[in-house]
C-alpha cells in the first residue's frame, strides 16, 4: 500500500508514489532520493553495459589455417556445395566424418558419403551424433558422442583467443540456425551478455562492436591481465593468466615447442625447424594446456609430434599434432643434418667400398646389408623401415589414438626425406 505521497523523478520527470524512491540517511535524517528506483536501475545497467574508453585492441578476429590434406573432395560424393566458399574438413578425432564451414556434416557409411541428420537439444542448439576416439580403461575406442554444430565450427575454423572462458557462442543476428563460421563469435559469459543486450536494444551486432567487447577489460575474466598477454617465451608465447605452474610438464612442453619454432640458437643446431611455427591459439599457454590435458594418455612417455598425421607439416596446432610414444616419434623424425650426403638410412663403407643400409631404433643399430648403389641400399632401408613401423603400430594398436595408428599404417619412406 502506498503512503499517498508523490514525487516527481528528476530523470523521467514522471510523478510517482514516494514508495518508488529509495531512502537516503544523512546526519540522522531520512531523505527520499529524487530519482526513482526504475530510473536508477536503468542508469546502473547502462554504466555496467557501456564500453570503456580507449580500448586496446589486443585480440583481433582471426580464422584458422586449414591444411589441404583435411579437405574432402566433394566430387567423390553426390553432395553439392551450398555456397562457393564451402569446404568440408576431416574431424581427426572422429570416425569418418567431415564438417563444413557452414555447419553441415558429412558421414561415410559403407563407402558412401551422406549428409548427417541434425536435431535440437532443449536449448534449441543444433546437434548430431558421431563416434569419437576416446581413451577408456587403457585403450582407445570409438564412443558415440554428441557434436554441437556451432561449437565444432568454432573449434575447427575460428581462432578462440581464450578457450578457458570463451565457451559461449554468439550467432550473428541471434540466428541459431546460421552456423557459417564468419557469423560465429566465441565469447565468455559476460561478453555474451553485453553483446546480446546491445543487440536487443539497438539491433547492432557488428564485428567492430563485438571485437571491442572482446577486448574491453571490464568484461574479461578475473584471471586475465594485460601482463598475461605479454609474449615472454621466444618473443611469441604468452601465459594467458596468472598462477601458471612453470614447473609442470605441460608448461615445459609448451616452452619447448616455442623454442623449436622461434629460437635462432636452436635453429643453428636443428635447421629442419627453421620454417616451423605455432598456430595462433597455441601462443596462449592456457589454450595449449586445455588441448594437451584432453589428449594426454597412458603411462608411457609421450612426445608432441607435428609430422606423423600430415607428412611435411610445419605448423604446431590442435588439428595437425598428436601425442605419440617416444619410440614411435623417434622412428618418424626426419633429420637432414644426421643423414649427410646420402639418402636416409644409407652410409658409404670405405673398407668394403659399398653402400650400407642401416636403421637406428632406440639407440641400437640394425644392419640391413651392403649394396652397390645408394638407391639399392635405400630400397632395402625403405622396405624394412615401413614394415617395422607397421609392426610397431600393430603392437601399440588400441594403446594409441586411431588417427596415429592409421598414419603409421600408411606411412611411406621417400628417398627425398
Language-model features: locations:
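A short beta-strand micro-motif
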Residues: 7-9, 357
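Flanking scaffold residues of small Cys/His-coordinated metal-binding clusters
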Residues: 3-4, 31
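Conserved recognition-core residues within compact binding domains
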Residues: 18-166, 175-302, 313-382, 386, ...
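Extended, polar beta-sheet/loop recognition surfaces of beta-rich domains
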Residues: 388-417
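Short cysteine-rich clusters marking metal-coordination/redox-active sites
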Residues: 9-12, 36
Amino acid at each position: 500500500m502506498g503512503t499517498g505521497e508523490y514525487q516527481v523523478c528528476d530523470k523521467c520527470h514522471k510523478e510517482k508514489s514516494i514508495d518508488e524512491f529509495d531512502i537516503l540517511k544523512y546526519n540522522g535524517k531520512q531523505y527520499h532520493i529524487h530519482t526513482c528506483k526504475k530510473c536508477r536501475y536503468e542508469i546502473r545497467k547502462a554504466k555496467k553495459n557501456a564500453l570503456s574508453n580507449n580500448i586496446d585492441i589486443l585480440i583481433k578476429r582471426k580464422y584458422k589455417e586449414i591444411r589441404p590434406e583435411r579437405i574432402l573432395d566433394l566430387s567423390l560424393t553426390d553432395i553439392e556445395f551450398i555456397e562457393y566458399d564451402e569446404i568440408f574438413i576431416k574431424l581427426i578425432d572422429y570416425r569418418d566424418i567431415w564438417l563444413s564451414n557452414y555447419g553441415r556434416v558429412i558421414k561415410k557409411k559403407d563407402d558412401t558419403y551422406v549428409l548427417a541428420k541434425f536435431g535440437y537439444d532443449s536449448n534449441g542448439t543444433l546437434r548430431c551424433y558421431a563416434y569419437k576416439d576416446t581413451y577408456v580403461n587403457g585403450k582407445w575406442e570409438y564412443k558415440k558422442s554428441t557434436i554441437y554444430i556451432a561449437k565444432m565450427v568454432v573449434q575447427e575454423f575460428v581462432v578462440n583467443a581464450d578457450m578457458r572462458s570463451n565457451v559461449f557462442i554468439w550467432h550473428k543476428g541471434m540466428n541459431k540456425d546460421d552456423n557459417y563460421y564468419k557469423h560465429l563469435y566465441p565469447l565468455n559469459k559476460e561478453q555474451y551478455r553485453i553483446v546480446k543486450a546491445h543487440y536487443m536494444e539497438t539491433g547492432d551486432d557488428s564485428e567492430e562492436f563485438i571485437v571491442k567487447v572482446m577486448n574491453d577489460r571490464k568484461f574479461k575474466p578475473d584471471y586475465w591481465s594485460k601482463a598475461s598477454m605479454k609474449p615472454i617465451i621466444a618473443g611469441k608465447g604468452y601465459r594467458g593468466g596468472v598462477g601458471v605452474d612453470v614447473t609442470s610438464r605441460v608448461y615445459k612442453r609448451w616452452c619447448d615447442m616455442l623454442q623449436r619454432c622461434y629460437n635462432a640458437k636452436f635453429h643453428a643446431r636443428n635447421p629442419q625447424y627453421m620454417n616451423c611455427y605455432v598456430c595462433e591459439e597455441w601462443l596462449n599457454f592456457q589454450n595449449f594446456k586445455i588441448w594437451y590435458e584432453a589428449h594426454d594418455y597412458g603411462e608411457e612417455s609421450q612426445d608432441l609430434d607435428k609430422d606423423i598425421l600430415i607428412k611435411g607439416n610445419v605448423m604446431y596446432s590442435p588439428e595437425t599434432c598428436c601425442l605419440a610414444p617416444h619410440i614411435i616419434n623417434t622412428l618418424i623424425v626426419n633429420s637432414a643434418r644426421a643423414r649427410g650426403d646420402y639418402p636416409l638410412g644409407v652410409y658409404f663403407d670405405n673398407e668394403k667400398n659399398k653402400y650400407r643400409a642401416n636403421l637406428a631404433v632406440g639407440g641400437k643399430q640394425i644392419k640391413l646389408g651392403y649394396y652397390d648403389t645408394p638407391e639399392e641400399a635405400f630400397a632395402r632401408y625403405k622396405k624394412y623401415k615401413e614394415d617395422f613401423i607397421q609392426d610397431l603400430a600393430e603392437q601399440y594398436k588400441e594403446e594409441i589414438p586411431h588417427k596415429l595408428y592409421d598414419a603409421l599404417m600408411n606411412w611411406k619412406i621417400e628417398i627425398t626425406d
